Design a protein with these regions (language model features):
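Sequence-level preference for short, compositionally simple segments enriched
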Residues: 1-221, 225-279
Length: 279
């Protein structure tokens, strides 16, 4: 079931979790649309990142939940860049890591002439040697550059799939390169993919404010120093929110709170670095 459907231009996500099984996230059907995805967790099993548009995902984790999982199923027709995953991690549970049964695949071409490129990917679980699968179309480009295993070793990609065949009567046949060059990889940048003619810059919204200084506790009163450009503060105990405030203090609840964390929030709602106080 869908966890996210993002159908507009200029969509950005930072530090979000998207969890489902099949079809977790459907991206825009408009191939001029831009999505920027940073520090996110995307989880699923079958075609769980699919659709069109130009999507740049950086420092994200693609988490696979079954053997034979398939990550992307794009349907780009006229996209300039397609799906671009930079400095991401591919991970999964024990079933997904069982390559002897059905290995995880990077993707398959749903419709049209889809594009997907994985650059500087860390693969914490084994990927099927062929890497990709057939579906309904021939990819314009399904490729990798500098894929590495969990230990940082460069993976050999000579067995990656380059020949594709569609489905049905008179099924199309074609090829796609499985590896791009260092020079090509260097063009798949934030500056080339995201700003466009309107100079959209979602990274500004995601900039982390520094951790509050002077964090201290007096009984149930927690205090800290002001952080420049902060619109508010959030107090955590582990993953649990203890409270939110616009000031530089918070009265703690009566139940014991052992380890406390405080972060500033910028004008766009992005969380800053955390100050930590252990009792």
């Amino acid at each position: 079931a869908l966890a996210m459907s993002s159908q507009a231009d200029r969509i950005a996500f930072n530090n979000c979790n998207f969890r489902s099984f099949q079809d977790t996230w459907m991206t825009s059907g408009n191939d001029t649309a831009r999505h920027y995805v940073k520090d996110c967790w995307i989880e699923g099993a079958v075609d769980y990142f699919y659709g069109g548009g130009n999507v740049l995902a950086e420092n994200c984790t693609f988490y696979n939940t079954r053997s034979g999982a398939i990550i992307v199923a794009p349907c780009h027709k006229d996209a300039k860049w397609g799906y671009v995953f930079r400095d991401c991690t591919i991970d999964g549970n024990e079933a997904a890591a069982n390559v002897k049964k059905w290995g995880v695949k990077l993707g398959r071409p749903w419709h049209n002439s889809p594009k997907t490129v994985y650059i500087h990917t860390t693969m914490n679980i084994p990927i099927s040697p062929e890497g990709w699968a057939n579906m309904g179309a021939i990819p314009a480009l399904f490729a990798e550059y500098d894929s590495r295993d969990a230990a940082g070793n460069v993976l050999q990609l000579d067995q990656r799939k380059t020949e594709y065949e569609g489905r049905g009567e008179n099924a199309p046949k074609g090829t796609s390169r499985a590896v791009i060059t260092a020079e090509e990889a260097a063009t798949y940048t934030y500056e080339n993919i995201i700003p466009g003619t309107d100079q959209w810059n979602p990274r500004v919204m995601m900039e982390k404010l520094p951790a509050p200084e002077g964090l201290k506790r007096k009984g149930r009163q927690l205090e800290w120093k002001s952080v420049k450009d902060a619109t508010g503060y959030i107090v955590f105990s582990g993953d649990r929110v203890v409270g939110m405030t616009r000031g530089m203090y918070l009265t703690l609840p009566e139940y014991p709170v052992m380890i406390l964390q405080v972060c500033a929030v910028n004008q766009y709602g992005s969380l800053g670095n955390k100050a930590i106080l252990s009792r």
